[in-house]
């Protein structure tokens, strides 16, 4: 868990700027870059550090975890958008949850600028709190949602799992109300 070196961050930054340039000039869905565009932009730099980062992306670009290397087929402009992560494997679930949470935050900020509230409903909410990164992000957006016209709502049948998260205190403190229905004997 050492993270990226400064030179790796630099080659990624350079590649991201290059692949987003056409999209920013003409922001339509067809111009939205995907992971293979980033992969190619890294290889085009002809630097060992860029090649190393590109090799690390191979699994997600052309390997068995390439599910995110495609244009989206989700119409995010509908009033109701549902994301289902059930089919994501264990390795992609955390990444998928972070992408979805980021998409939802984008919708909240967009709706706020239009004076519209956004209702965010997360079923099986305890799953978001299992992983440290998604739990921290959940707590952060939960706090910000209310200020930005969002109505965050979490539902779970596993209250015990929910309460075991260190982030749950922040979430509960930033909730107007909490409703507990009949619990299984193990969750009482």
PLM feature spans:
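A short beta-strand-to-loop transition that corresponds to the Sensor-1 phosphate-sensing loop
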Residues: 154-159, 182-185
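Short flexible/disordered coil segments
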Residues: 95, 177-186
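A short helix-turn-beta junction within AAA+ P-loop NTPase domains corresponding to the substrate/partner-engaging
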Residues: 166-181
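Short glycine-/polar-rich loops that comprise or flank the Walker A/P-loop
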Residues: 78, 148-150, 173-177, 187
């Amino acid at each position: 868990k050492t993270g990226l070196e400064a030179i790796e961050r630099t080659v990624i930054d350079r590649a991201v700027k290059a692949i987003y340039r056409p999209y920013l000039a003409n922001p339509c869905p067809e111009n939205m870059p995907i992971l293979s565009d980033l992969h190619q932009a890294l290889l085009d730099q002809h630097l060992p550090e860029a090649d190393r980062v590109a090799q690390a992306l191979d699994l997600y670009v052309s390997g068995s975890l390439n599910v995110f290397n495609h244009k989206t087929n989700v119409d995010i402009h509908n009033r109701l958008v549902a994301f289902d992560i059930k089919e994501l494997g264990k390795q992609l679930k955390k990444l998928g949850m972070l992408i979805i949470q980021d998409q939802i935050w984008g919708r909240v900020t967009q709706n706020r600028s239009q004076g519209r509230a956004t209702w965010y409903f997360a079923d099986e909410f305890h799953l978001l709190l299992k992983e440290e990164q998604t739990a921290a992000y959940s707590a952060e957006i939960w706090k910000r949602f209310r200020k930005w016209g969002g109505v965050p709502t979490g539902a779970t049948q596993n209250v015990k799992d929910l309460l075991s998260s260190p982030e749950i205190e922040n979430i509960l403190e930033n909730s107007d109300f909490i409703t507990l229905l009949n619990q299984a004997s193990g969750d009482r």
